C-alpha cells in the first residue's frame, strides 16, 4: 500500500509541476503595429470619414428649419435661391453670377425620390452628390428621374428613368442660367 501511495504521490507531484509550469508560461502577444502602420491606418480612416462628417454637419445646418428660413429647407424639399449670387455669397465656392441655384437634401433610405426636369431653352442641369461629395450623376435632359439606392427593388411609373446613387444621403444642386438678351 505504501508503494502505491508513493507512486500516486510522485505522479501527483509531477502533474502539479506540469500544471504550474503551464500556468506560468509566457503568453505570446500579437505583434504591435509600428508607428508608420498606425499612422497610415489613422490617415486612411480620416480621409474616408471626414467628408461624411462634414456632409452631415452641412445637411444638419441646411435642413434645420421649418421651411420659413431663407437659404434652408427641410429634407426632401427644395431651397430656391431668392437672388443671384454676388461677391458677398460665401456658401459655395465660386458660384456663377448668371445662374439661379436650387438645393435639396434627399433622404432615399426607404424609397426613391422622383425629380422632374422640364424642357427649357436655357442651360439647366441637376448635379447629384453622394455623402462623400462625389458627383454621382448629372441630369441634363428634360425628363422624370427616380433617384434611388442601388439595392432598391420596386416598380417605377412608365417614363421615369432610374438613377442610382451610392448613399442614402444625397444632395441635389440645380443650376439654371438666366436668359440671354
Model-flagged regions — what are they?
Residues 25:
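Short, conserved catalytic or interaction motifs in soluble domains
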Residues 1-4:
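Positively charged n-region of N-terminal signal peptides that target proteins for export
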Residues 130-173:
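An exposed acidic His-Trp-rich patch
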Residues 28-40, 44:
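N-terminal low-complexity, Pro/Thr/Ser-rich intrinsically disordered segments
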Residues 21-22:
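C-terminal motif of bacterial Sec signal peptides marking the signal peptidase cleavage site
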Residues 174-180:
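Conserved small/polar residues in nucleotide/adenosyl-binding loops
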Residues 43-141:
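Glycine-rich, compositionally biased intrinsically disordered regions
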Residues 9-18:
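Bacterial N-terminal signal peptides
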Amino acid at each position: 500500500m505504501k508503494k502505491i501511495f508513493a507512486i500516486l504521490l510522485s505522479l501527483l507531484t509531477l502533474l502539479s509541476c506540469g500544471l504550474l509550469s503551464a500556468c506560468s508560461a509566457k503568453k505570446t502577444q500579437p505583434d504591435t503595429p509600428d508607428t508608420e502602420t498606425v499612422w497610415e491606418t489613422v490617415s486612411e480612416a480620416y480621409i474616408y470619414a471626414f467628408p461624411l462628417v462634414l456632409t452631415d454637419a452641412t445637411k444638419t445646418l441646411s435642413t434645420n428649419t421649418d421651411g420659413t428660413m431663407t437659404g434652408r429647407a427641410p429634407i426632401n424639399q427644395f431651397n430656391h435661391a431668392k437672388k443671384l449670387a454676388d461677391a458677398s455669397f460665401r456658401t459655395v465656392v465660386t458660384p456663377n453670377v448668371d445662374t439661379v441655384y436650387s438645393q435639396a437634401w434627399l433622404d432615399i433610405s426607404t424609397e426613391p425620390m422622383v425629380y422632374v426636369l422640364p424642357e427649357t431653352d436655357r442651360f439647366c442641369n441637376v448635379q447629384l452628390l453622394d455623402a462623400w461629395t462625389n458627383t454621382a450623376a448629372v441630369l441634363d435632359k428634360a425628363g422624370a428621374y427616380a433617384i434611388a439606392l442601388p439595392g432598391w427593388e420596386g416598380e417605377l411609373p412608365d417614363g421615369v428613368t432610374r438613377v442610382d446613387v451610392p448613399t442614402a444621403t444625397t444632395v441635389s444642386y440645380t443650376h439654371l442660367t438666366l436668359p440671354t438678351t
